[in-house]
């Protein structure tokens, strides 16, 4: 299985946010989709603390899906489904056969920074179709605000990402807000997180 130190550091604070935004629904059985699950550390950690959510992890890389399977087996996570191949930049009807209005929550953790803008567009278009009414999309990572990136460590990260791939980089929160609006969602909350990251919470109207 793969190990991400960054995922290990962030999983506790992310869990706290997700539990808080879902606390009013913890009496129901919920269905969650994680886009770009990576190693699988996050999803199994969430599953252990939130048994009321059934999670579907996804990733485009076979190596990552194998790692997710290993974490599921190692933790005996009963509410994490077999990981699927899902490219969020594709139209929603290619999202692993998920029907419209089928998800209560969709997570995109450190996905939008490491992918082209077409992926961000796909995430919001797809979420607008796949989420139930009042369902939530939560994105996490460092962002630009009104074209400005702070602090210096995030500026340096943005430069590094663009050197790796000119189409990568820190997305602007105002651009994401507009993408959400164009796809029947609104940005409901911006939560400050450790290490100069933020959680953005969007709700489907």
UniProtKB/Swiss-Prot annotation:
Signal peptide: none annotated. InterPro entries: DUF938 (IPR010342), SAM-dependent_MTases_sf (IPR029063). It holds the Pfam family DUF938. Belongs to the UPF0585 family. PANTHER family: METHYLTRANSFERASE-LIKE 26 B, UPF0585 PROTEIN CG18661. This is Methyltransferase-like 26 B. The gene is mettl26b.
